[in-house]
């Protein structure tokens, strides 16, 4: 959850709720003068209007072509909740978000993802090329600690015969996984921190344990629970396609998709103050830069 994205969502909700209210009433009164709804709306529109009208417009465009169910949103929401563990409610509160408003943002993100996937090349030729470097999902457990000395202490306890799950519960700072013995959800290549992923895939057999691995989060000790098993393209095709589509969800591809969807939707901006809101999508930005 990027802070900018979260704060932006809060601002957007405030901005357009004011627009719906209208009436020009006061939002603040002082002896020196009042701040009206119109003044606040105009100020927020000037600063944030283009960004938010983009999202609202694309919600309409994409929502008309692609379907995201409540179940889809709930599934993604639970993934975030699991990722942040006990800190999830605090993160939402600190960002001024409720579960409802965060789910609204998740729905938009999923619409963009579905549109991008629908525009991806999923021919056998493309999938077979991807299959050359594809690796199946693996399942591992980890113990995360803050410093190298603590990691070496845990490593020694493992060598002395202590159970991995017991040490995860005792030492791991990952609150989302420690009570489950440190086990993470299955993941494939490109999904985790590169150093963590490299060390995890280097473990070939069930029960293999890594040396301490440093990442931006601290030091990890990783245990292989379910190693990768690559068979043939035909047998692996479903999993390959899922991983391939996930790999296509880059900023560049999403931007290309939004440009295509914008062009197909016959968009007309009727508010002169927001006439440049879609310059990155209608080609006017490149025209301006060439002048």
From Swiss-Prot:
Q: Which residues form the PpiC domain?
A: 135-226
Provide the family line: Belongs to the PrsA family.
Which GO cellular component terms, listed alphabetically, does the Swiss-Prot or TrEMBL entry include? plasma membrane
Where is it located? Answer: Cell membrane
UniProt keyword list: Cell membrane, Isomerase, Lipoprotein, Membrane, Palmitate, Rotamase, Signal
Kindly provide the name given to this protein in its UniProt entry. Foldase protein PrsA 2
**EC number(s) per entry:** 5.2.1.8
**InterPro entries per the UniProt record, alphabetical:** Foldase_PrsA, PPIase_dom_sf, PPIase_PpiC, PrsA_foldase, Trigger_fact/SurA_dom_sf
What is the recorded function of this protein according to its Swiss-Prot or TrEMBL entry?
Plays a major role in protein secretion by helping the post-translocational extracellular folding of several secreted proteins.
List lipidated residues, N-palmitoyl cysteine: 21
Signal peptide positions (record): 1-20
**Which EC main class describes this enzyme?**
isomerase
Cystine crosslinks: none
Membrane topology, record value: Lipid-anchor
The principal location of this protein is: membrane
A Gene Ontology molecular-function term?
Answer: peptidyl-prolyl cis-trans isomerase activity
Q: Where is the lipid attached (S-diacylglycerol cysteine)?
A: 21
Gene name of this polypeptide: prsA2
Under catalytic activity, the entry for this protein gives:
[protein]-peptidylproline (omega=180) = [protein]-peptidylproline (omega=0)
Query: Which parts of the chain span the membrane according to its record?
Result: none
The record's listing under PANTHER family reads: FOLDASE PROTEIN PRSA, PEPTIDYLPROLYL ISOMERASE
Pfam families for the chain: Rotamase_3
User: Which SUPFAM superfamilies does the entry link to?
Assistant: FKBP-like (SSF54534), Triger factor/SurA peptide-binding domain-like (SSF109998)
Q: Which processes are annotated in GO (biological process)?
A: protein folding
């Amino acid at each position: 959850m990027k802070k900018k994205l979260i704060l932006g969502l809060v601002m957007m909700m405030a901005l357009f709720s004011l627009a719906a209210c209208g009436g020009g009433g006061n939002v603040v009164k002082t002896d020196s003068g009042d701040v009206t709804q119109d003044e606040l709306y105009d100020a927020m529109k000037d600063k944030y209007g283009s960004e938010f009208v983009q999202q609202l417009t694309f919600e309409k465009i994409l929502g008309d072509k692609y379907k995201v169910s409540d179940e889809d949103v709930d599934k993604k929401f639970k993934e975030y909740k699991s990722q942040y563990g006990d800190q999830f409610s605090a993160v939402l509160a600190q960002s001024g978000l409720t579960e409802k408003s965060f789910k609204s943002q998740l729905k938009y993100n999923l619409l963009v993802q579905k549109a991008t996937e629908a525009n991806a090349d999923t021919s056998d030729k493309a999938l077979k090329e991807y299959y050359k470097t594809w690796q199946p999902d693996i399942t591992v457990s980890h113990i995360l600690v803050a410093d190298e000395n603590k990691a070496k202490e845990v490593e020694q306890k493992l060598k002395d015969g202590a159970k991995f799950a017991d040490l995860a519960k005792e030492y791991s700072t990952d609150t989302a996984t420690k009570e489950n013995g440190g086990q993470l959800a299955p993941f494939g290549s490109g999904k985790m921190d590169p150093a963590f992923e490299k060390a995890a895939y280097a473990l070939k057999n069930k029960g293999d344990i890594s040396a301490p691995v440093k990442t931006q989060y601290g030091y990890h000790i990783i245990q292989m629970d379910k190693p990768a098993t690559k068979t043939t393209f035909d047998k692996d095709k479903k999993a390959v396609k899922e991983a391939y589509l996930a790999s296509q969800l880059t900023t560049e591809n999403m931007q290309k998709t939004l440009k295509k969807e914008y062009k197909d939707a016959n968009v007309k901006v009727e508010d002169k103050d927001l006439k440049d809101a879609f310059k990155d999508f209608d080609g006017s930005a490149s025209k301006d830069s060439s002048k």
